[in-house]
Amino acid sequence: VNQYAMPPRLESRLRTIKFAHYLQKAGYEVTIFASSIMHNMDIDLIEDDSLYIERQYGDLNFVHIKTAKYKGNGLKRVIGLIQFPRRFLKIAEKFPAPDCIIQTATVPFGNIIYRYARKVKVKYIVEVLDLWPETFVDLGILNKKNPIVPLLYKFEKWLYTKADQVVFSMEGGRDYIIDKKWDTDHGGPIDLKKVFYINNGVDLADFNHFKEQFKLQDASLEDESVKKVIYLGSIRLANNLKKLIDAAALLKEHKDVVFFLYGDGDDRKDLQK
C-alpha cells in the first residue's frame, strides 16, 4: 500500500514497483494499492466518479484509488491523504485477503490501515521512506513549538509500535528510534529486533541497459584534467541544492573543479536565478 506509487511509464521513485516485480519473480502474488493522482503531475488516472480502477502494467497489478487532485502541499493534498486510507478500507474486502500488508508510512494518515491488517489477521510491515514529521521540522515547514508536532510524533511512535516489522529505506532508522527513547532499552515499546534497513538499491538489468542506451555526450565529462562534482536527482527543498551551489560559487576560481547538476523540481527556477 503506497499512495504515491505510479505506473512504470510515470514512476521515478522505483522502490515499490521494483520490490513488487522481484517479489513476483520469487513466487509471491503482489497487488499495489495506490492513488489515482500522480504526484507532482497534473494527471488523474480515473476520469469519472469511479472509486477505484484495476490496471495491469506488465507483471504489475495495480489498484488505483480515487483521491482529490492537488498541486503543491496545500489543503487538497491533505484531503487526499485522508481520503486514501479510508477509501482503501472501503474497497479492501472486494479483493482476496492478503497474507501480508506492506504499507509505506504516511503518518498519521496511513495509521488506519493497521486496523484492517489486524481485522484480517495478517502480518503488517511498515516501510519508512521519509521521517514524518521529523523531515518537516528539520526543513522548517513545521515549528517544534507547533502543538500538532508532538501529536504527529505520537502517531509515528504508535505506528512503529504496532507494526510487526519496520523497514527503513535509509541508514540510521534504529538510531532515530533510540534517540527518541522509543526502544525497549529506554523504557519504550519498540523492540529493535523488528527494525530493519533495506536501501533502494539498483536494478542491475536496468543499469546495464541504460548505461549503453542513454549515453550523455558532454566534453566536460570526458575531460580528465578536471575534478568533477556530480549531483543527480530531484531539485527540491529537501535536498538542499542551494548549499551545493554556494559551494560551487566559493570554488569558481578553481578552474580544475567543475560542478554538474542533473535533475528537475520545484526549486530549479529559483536556484537558476
Regions found by a protein language model. Name each.
Residues V1-G58, E171, D246-L251:
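N-terminal subdomain of nucleotide-sugar transferases
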Residues S36, S169-G172, I198-G201:
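Carbohydrate-associated surface elements
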